[in-house]
From Swiss-Prot:
It comes from Salmonella dublin (strain CT_02021853). PROSITE patterns: GHMP_KINASES_ATP (PS00627). Catalyzes the ATP-dependent phosphorylation of L-homoserine to L-homoserine phosphate. The gene is thrB. GO terms for molecular function: ATP binding; homoserine kinase activity. InterPro entries: GHMP_kinase_C_dom (IPR013750), GHMP_kinase_C_sf (IPR036554), GHMP_kinase_N_dom (IPR006204), GHMP_knse_ATP-bd_CS (IPR006203), Homoserine_kinase (IPR000870), Ribosomal_Su5_D2-typ_SF (IPR020568), Ribsml_uS5_D2-typ_fold_subgr (IPR014721). It catalyses: L-homoserine + ATP = O-phospho-L-homoserine + ADP + H(+). This is Homoserine kinase. Belongs to the GHMP kinase family. Homoserine kinase subfamily. Its main location: cytoplasm. ATP binds at residues 91-101. Disulfide bonds: none annotated. Its EC number is 2.7.1.39. Keywords: Amino-acid biosynthesis, ATP-binding, Cytoplasm, Kinase, Nucleotide-binding, Threonine biosynthesis, Transferase.
Length: 309
């Protein structure tokens, strides 16, 4: 049997709509991600378990893990009978790359089970295709960091899908999921079809400056450039209490904050453990809306998807 863990990810990072994403892991050792196991069988079977298994489609063919198996078999040109188990630890529609976790874990597990017939580039292309079935369009800002680890910048030129951007070891990512669902498709539909020239210029300046600051090792500058003129001005209205939370974490000392992916998870960047804890405490009390919500203090997950059994 092969068992693969795929970590949560925070896409966009305010400054890089659809082109930046970071894999994250809680500092307390909690596994924030999905696990898929694969073993040989006489015919295909899929079993779901985990905290959020009851939120998955009841029809197996609608489950993205089934679709991953089907697409992987197509890529190899043969049917591979396996029993798969999805441990669904990630809330759906959370802005933490939930569908990407399932897709990445399923495809890596299938590839490992079959002796790695597909290389990383081919696997990543399949991951983007399958994740796009859920979000409505192909983009790699969750699957790339989830698969490869760290911060990833989407390139999609010269056969290169993404490349790693150096992160900062001192950065702590406080992630607060309020316990409500935001559909990625709905969050995309709310965005305008056209943007003002000054917003396009600001977006380019922020993103170019952020990448430069990462490579020139200027964490304060990088954090200061994490501004969103593309999505947050429109999506904030979908997130109850978001604007107040941003103001509060800034006053506590967060370097930057914003919407993780399409929401509703809020991320706040801190460079001191005590600041991160104070931010986490405030968000736990004021941003969470129900028992399904949670707050984690995380660092970059530099390993990405990995075999755990």
């Amino acid at each position: 049997m092969v068992k693969v863990y795929a970590p949560a990810s925070s896409a966009n990072m305010s400054v890089g709509f659809d082109v930046l994403g970071a894999a994250v892991t809680p500092v307390d050792g909690t596994l924030l991600g999905d696990v898929v196991s694969v073993e040989a069988a006489n015919h295909f079977r899929l079993h779901n378990l985990g905290r959020f298994a009851d939120k998955l489609p009841p029809e197996p063919r609608e489950n993205i893990v089934y679709q991953c198996w089907e697409r992987f078999c197509q890529a190899l040109g043969k049917t591979i009978p396996v029993a798969m188990t999805l441990e669904k630890n990630m809330p759906i529609g959370s802005g933490l790359g939930s569908s990407a976790c399932s897709v990445v874990a399923a495809l890596v597990a299938m590839n490992e089970h079959c002796g790695k017939p597909l290389n990383d580039t081919r696997l990543l292309a399949l991951m983007g295709e399958l994740e796009g079935r859920i979000s409505g369009s192909i983009h790699y800002d969750n699957v790339a960091p989830c698969f490869l680890g760290g911060m990833q910048l989407m390139i999609e030129e010269n056969g290169i899908i993404s490349q790693q951007v150096p992160g900062f070891d001192e950065w702590l990512w406080v992630l607060a999921y309020p316990g409500i669902k935001v559909s990625t498709a709905e969050a995309r539909a709310i965005l305008p079809a056209q943007y003002r020239r000054q917003d396009c210029i600001a977006h380019g300046r922020h993103l170019a400056g952020f990448i430069h600051a990462c490579y020139s090792r200027q964490p304060q500058l990088a954090a200061a450039l994490m501004k969103d003129v593309i999505a947050e001005p429109y999506r904030a209205r979908l997130l109850p209490g978001f604007s107040q939370a941003r103001q509060a974490v800034s006053e506590i000392g967060a370097l930057a904050s914003g919407i993780s992916g399409s929401g509703p998870t809020l991320f706040a960047l801190c460079d001191k453990p005590e600041t991160a804890q104070r931010v986490a405490d405030w968000l736990s009390k004021h941003y969470l809306q129900n028992q399904e919500g949670f707050v984690h203090i995380c660092r970059l997950d530099t390993a990405g998807a990995r075999v755990v059994g």
